[in-house]
Amino acid sequence: MLIERGLLSIMASKCSGTWSTYKTYTTANGCPFMKPEGPPADGRTLALNDHHLVESLAHFNREKIPERAVHAKGAAAYGEFEVTADISDICNIDMLLGVGKKTPCVTRFSTTGLERGSAEGMRDLKGMATKFYTKEGNWDWVCLNFPFFFIRDPLKFPSLMHAQRRDPRTNLLNPNMYWDWVTSNHESLHMVLLQFSDFGTMFNWRSLSGYMGHAYKWVMPNGSFKYVHIFLSSDRGPNFSQGEQAKDNSDLDPDHATRDLYEAIERGDYPTWTANVQVVDPAEAPDLGFNILDVTKHWNLGTYPKDLPKIPSRPFGKLTLNRIPDNFFAEVEQLAFSPSNMVPGVLPSEDPILQARMFAYPDAQRYRLGPNHHKIPVNQCPMTFNPTLRDGTGTFDANYGSLPGYVSESQGVNFARPQEHDPKFNAWLSQLSSRPWMQTNENDYKFPRDFYNALPEFRSQEFQDKMVENIIASVAQTRREIREKVYHTFHLVDPELSARVKRGVEKMDASFKQVSLSRL
């Protein structure tokens, strides 16, 4: 027993990064070994009985783990979250109760669609996920830099991602695939326009804002609740890469956003974000003019649509990142997030995309990191107690010792009270369920139309013009039948937008033909 405790103590010290007492080079089993260079000391030829060589090569072959199915490329930093305003009137979450309360956290920024080696400056959604190590468990805020998404039907997600990835025949990016999918799924048009604006090419991670997109429920002790949408706005303000600048950033330094983040933190220029919450009383939800559970629409902050109610935000906290991880693989590549990681006082809404993500994210981590991914130090909550989750690949702790693999009151286990809410607050859901809101509807054209027409006002005319130019450059690479579908689809949004895209594509075609003829 004493030997076992001693070994556990040594293992704990190693896991904590205390290596000062372990200076002798060894093989994997701890056997001291000579310097790992050159042929065997006795001059014999290399053979499989050279245990150190076999061990080194075999381990090298297994260094890589599956990359993330989405958000493959990323960077992370540690920091803290501080409550800056009293929101106890709408919130019963321990982490957010008490102005000045601080919680340690880690934030990972990422690209979305392409592989781990892709350039950070490419036109793409960007991820911003934060894990808060609270006293009541780990709470994950899994955000994108856009406040809405392409789809509201989770069955469409695999096809959406495949359409944005590489052609299975050539392994090249293929605009035909992307625009063919868009023109068959009109609920995506709101997101498409935002993606092709300069919002789609953010310059660095420090300027990125993160939006949960989904509605969650903040539940009070009496069972009442509010629908909420949380977002983190960069205190630096947005910083866009435009046109050739975005291409230059990707070509010259595909890791420029990560480099910028790490260099800023190392020189003490810590990036900060303001946490905001938008609140909707369930009784008011039917009167907003759109479905707050439809993640293809945003909660209007006053920019657009002008004819729909504004849903103001309340600032309540400050996120500061101030430390770079010591080891990328251990602390960034193995970092695992999920929208299902919540704490008391929070419940998911009925948003079908949110509910699908609550399964898909942990399942992706089980595939990528194993069934015990929650025990990896960067993911671990020190208060975790669940002896039903035991054994399996990656079990390197005491595995709950001799405790049985079930729980009951007779074991002296404490259980939290059920987190319930008053069903009368869900009355409007019965109205919602009677409407076929998964089908394409007028709001699927209204929101992108209002975004397009509002751009000159809340950004600039130049911002709108560049968005159209970016669309033209992409559509011009497609086949003629795809182009015709694009023109028709954009006509449903705004005839002027459709006409501008068509004129621009035809102009590019004419210029290309002229250049081709001049080379004859």
Curated annotation (Swiss-Prot):
Per its UniProt record, the required cofactor names are:
heme
Binding locations of heme:
361
Q: Name one GO cellular component term.
A: mitochondrion
| Listed Gene3D superfamilies | Catalase core domain
Say how it is used.
Answer: Ergot alkaloids are known for their toxic effects on humans who consume contaminated grains or livestock that graze on grasses harboring ergot alkaloid-producing fungi. Due to their strong affinity for monoamine neurotransmitter receptors they may also have clinical uses such as treatment of migraines, Parkinson's disease and cerebrovascular insufficiency.
Q: What happens when the gene is disrupted?
A: Accumulates the intermediate 4-dimethylallyl-L-abrine.
Q: In which pathway does it act?
A: Alkaloid biosynthesis; ergot alkaloid biosynthesis
The residues annotated as the active site are 71
GO molecular function: any one? catalase activity
> What SMART domains does the entry give?
Catalase
**What is this protein's function per UniProt?**
Catalase; part of the gene cluster that mediates the biosynthesis of fumiclavanine C, a fungal ergot alkaloid. DmaW catalyzes the first step of ergot alkaloid biosynthesis by condensing dimethylallyl diphosphate (DMAP) and tryptophan to form 4-dimethylallyl-L-tryptophan. The second step is catalyzed by the methyltransferase easF that methylates 4-dimethylallyl-L-tryptophan in the presence of S-adenosyl-L-methionine, resulting in the formation of 4-dimethylallyl-L-abrine.
Protein name listed in UniProt? Catalase easC
Native organism: Aspergillus fumigatus (strain ATCC MYA-4609 / CBS 101355 / FGSC A1100 / Af293)
Protein encoded by which gene:
easC
